[in-house]
Amino acid sequence: MKNNWMWCLVVLLSLGTIVPLQAQTGGTEKEVAALEQQWLQSQKTNNPDLVAPLIADKFIGTGADGKVTDRAQLLAAAKGSKYDSMEYEDVKVTAFGNTAIATGASRVKGTDETGKPMDTHVRWTDTWVKMANGKWQCVASHVSLIKS
């Protein structure tokens, strides 16, 4: 009988640690989704200062053209691009402890930093890490062209 009570106690204590973890995961996913929306606002308003704090110093991005960019290149491109419209679709965030993966698609119309017109549909994946200071930053991003 004593062993049964011990076993029940272990199970109940285990549930107590699982429930907060699930709540934290849901909060993490909402927090990272909000950061993705902040990134979108930055692009729509042509204001790279909104996204700069969200991009890690060692950021690595891969564009739909296969070019690899760093943080400085990403922010320079954001400053020079002009968007007539940009909307996110099918955004999903999955948390894995201090890492979160955000995926989605974007329809983009406007001009890029070189003045070339854009009218594209892309799928993207962003990798976010919760840094030592407790803030989330995007460490990697990959964009693929969706063919019509």
Predicted regions span which residues?
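A detector of low-complexity, intrinsically disordered, Ser/Thr/Gly/Pro/Ala-rich segments
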Residues: N4, L15, A23-G26
